[in-house]
Amino acid sequence: MKSLQALFGGTFDPVHYGHLKPVETLANLIGLTRVTIIPNNVPPHRPQPEANSVQRKHMLELAIANKPLFTLDERELKRNAPSYTAQTLKEWRQEQGPDVPLAFIIGQDSLLTFPTWYEYETILDNAHLIVCRRPGYPLEMAQPQYQQWLEDHLTHNQEDLHLQPAGKIYLAETPWFNISATIIRERLQNGESCEDLLPEPVLTYINQQGLYR
């Protein structure tokens, strides 16, 4: 049986413990040995990043330098176009072949808006969705047809993620950290401490670069 590979996308502006710690727990829960972080260059669903792509790449490299679970994929940073998950997963599937189990990790907030994503219906053709639960978010989609879509693909058996190459949605019980990039940027702008929110090398780099001031 080929091992499950997971992709974790985001803006990472900046990367922080709220990104890393839930995924580390997730890896232990479901048996992931490698998580590929894929920062996006031009996110289509949110405001554009304050740090440029080179700076965000460096912050990620610093954050995962001593974490063998994580590796970095720069393909979306090299595109001068919107970063569409559907497109990236098609490429990833072509590279890995038809039989390797692949998964894309998202937060529960992203699941609720998932049907607005570009070609969202193709994503489960190429990967599973692993959803990190977040308190305060509903478990139901806004419209009945999307709720049916969720129920059609939902599994409560994590073994399905390893045995099938794609097509399942799994809700993972991961810890939630009340940390966001917005909170960090606001604290930095106000001259407040962020030592408890992100890795020390990342904070040092932010200060050296004068970011988020």
Swiss-Prot record:
Family: Belongs to the NadD family.
Chain ranges passing through the membrane: none
Signal peptide bounds: none
Pathway: Cofactor biosynthesis; NAD(+) biosynthesis; deamido-NAD(+) from nicotinate D-ribonucleotide: step 1/1
Protein name per its UniProtKB record: Probable nicotinate-nucleotide adenylyltransferase
Enzyme class, broadest EC rank: transferase
Keyword annotations of the record: ATP-binding, NAD, Nucleotide-binding, Nucleotidyltransferase, Pyridine nucleotide biosynthesis, Transferase
SUPFAM superfamilies, per database record: Nucleotidylyl transferase
Organism: Shigella boydii serotype 4 (strain Sb227)
Gene3D superfamilies: HUPs
HAMAP family attached to this UniProt entry: NaMN_adenylyltr
Catalytic activity: nicotinate beta-D-ribonucleotide + ATP + H(+) = deamido-NAD(+) + diphosphate
